[in-house]
Amino acid sequence: MKPTLFVLAAGMGSRYGGLKQLDGLGPNGETIMDYSIFDAIRGGFGKLVFVIRKSFEKDFREKIISKYENHIPVEVVFQDLNDLPEGFTCPEGREKPWGTNHAVLMGKKVINEPFAVINADDFYGRDSFAVLGKQLSEMDGKKNDYCMVGYRVGNTLSESGSVARGVCATNEEGYLTGVVERTAIERIDGDIQFVDENGKKVVLEENTPVSMNMWGFTPDYFEYSEEYFKEFLKANMGNLKSEYFIPLMVNKLITEGTARVKVLDTTSKCFGVTYAADRQGVVDKIQALVDAGEYPSKLF
């Protein structure tokens, strides 16, 4: 069975402003997501599932989904603040979505095969989809054995400012032992560095694997996520800004010994429009890839 690509497209794009998922950056107005879908199809994926907010469904169907429907089956699910397990209600005053792993849970009703999870607004690159697609095709019928694409941190930096990245630690066999979210990572005087929680400057090696939220799971992940989400809600219901992130869930499963996560290396560079000032650079990078023959000028 071919794997499914699950696209997280419910985010607001707060730092950049506007619906950045719909921003045309390619030579014929292609979005970053168009390139991900194109790469996924040629990487062996057989279905798309988008998680979006109900409020922009019409726009999304007209501008985005209509392009793909003749190339690959497409389904849409919705992330909603009130979509909570039985016995829980959304606290008054909460506006922030419940986080990426809550968004992933929305796919439970429509996904029964190994699946990848990606952000809608990151350009992941051809090699990453080829590597992940191959791994997922070997995971059919398995349980508790997941994977993620580990980007080399030097291939993920923004020229317009610092970035936050999940810095990965691995064991000798290449399995994830933990992900630590680090903020304000940037290249200064040739060194990639960040400041840790003690105010100390830490230099990262160029090839240090980081998570760009490109994961590979099997359907049993939904069951674990549902159970842990209840624990998360009990502990965090009073915090209106708390979020249930994928790395939180993954770290818990690894720490408990419930599952293992293979870190897949990729030569791809990952980039996106973190800041409005990034936009032109992304346009130029995509054009360079088209000029080099990596992508056709018109995708769909």
Question: How would you describe each model-predicted region?
Answer:
Residues R279-K298:
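Long, low-complexity C-terminal extensions of enzymes
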Residues T4-G17:
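A phosphate-binding catalytic loop at a beta-strand-loop-alpha-helix junction
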Residues E226-A259:
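A C-terminal functional module that forms or caps the active site or interfaces directly
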